[in-house]
């Protein structure tokens, strides 16, 4: 295993980080001791200038690929006195606002007095974000309809211009949530419309923790596996079922855990090995050292030996069963899959199935409702609604990405058919009246309850 240890607090060379741009774009980079990283229109910077700072620090690009730390991407880095002046200027700027946008007349670029040539000239005057801030201030001053906007519209306008002209970026830790955000922006279909909040809900419902043994189906390219490894601190076992020759876990290339630790934690098994492990087991016997020395291609022999041991190891895990949870992010028909999976899950352990379509989970829920092995299968969904805030006021953002998918959650139980539950809903057994004879020979009917009294 590599001696490199991934840091969760400090920017250091040798690890992958997530760079957030003013345009809300995301970029994953691998940091080296030296080198220049380009950020497109936002400029480029020398890697050595950001090493040693805490993760989450924002930087501003200045001349000669140099950077300086700032408070955040959207706020100016000012002294206390300058910050007070800037706050007063912004307050004055936003004080001339309307209650609504009905007085705005859309006449296109004619409403802006600052021409494109003027903006290009300002850009050439320097590479610092101070130039970008100056452009924004001149554009606001030259906007004839700025005072007719509501204060919320004014802030949105200011934010759009900051995203376009400020040369800034933030370096964040690349965790499971951050990696999912990156794939959502890059290729939403790859992660099956999974949202960050839904991923967190899945890990909570499945009780993922260090030292656990989990059975999963991951069709997100390894994003689910990445998030589980991070939450488990690489302590425990993850058995991933796949339907191809090799499991698609390409997202693990950003993990920085090393091949040895990944191999130790994550085991892959195909469906044939999972359903019929006995026929897929490899009978392997190590050759004596004398015969190994005679082999010309020793590397090929070692690869065959390692593969046989890995396959037999994961088959042994499948045969033992008693997994701590089953987690699925897949497009497979779960009604059929669960018939093979449920016997491998331990009692009182969670079953968590994700699908981007609710109708698919309704079919699974209907199938499990009559199955005594799964208790209370329920479907959940979660939504996070962002809000735009200004001092003293707030309102929800009017447009947001939909989707996020749905989760089916149930508890694996071990039914016992020989036990009959008695309790509420069962009527009491009626007492049987038996005849008894008196001393005179007459028959008298007595109640068993009265006799016992």
Curated annotation (Swiss-Prot):
UniProt cross-references to InterPro entries, sorted A to Z: TRM6
Subcellular localization, as worded in the UniProt entry: Nucleus
Predominant subcellular localization, coarse grouping: nucleus
The keyword Nuclease appears for this protein: no
Superkingdom of the organism of origin: Eukaryota
Gene Ontology cellular component terms for the protein in this record: nucleus; tRNA (m1A) methyltransferase complex
GO molecular function: RNA binding; tRNA (adenine(58)-N1)-methyltransferase activity
GO biological process per UniProt: tRNA methylation
Pfam families: Gcd10p (PF04189)
Protein name as it appears in the record: tRNA (adenine(58)-N(1))-methyltransferase non-catalytic subunit TRM6
Lineage: Eukaryota, Fungi, Dikarya, Ascomycota, Saccharomycotina
Encoding gene (name): TRM6
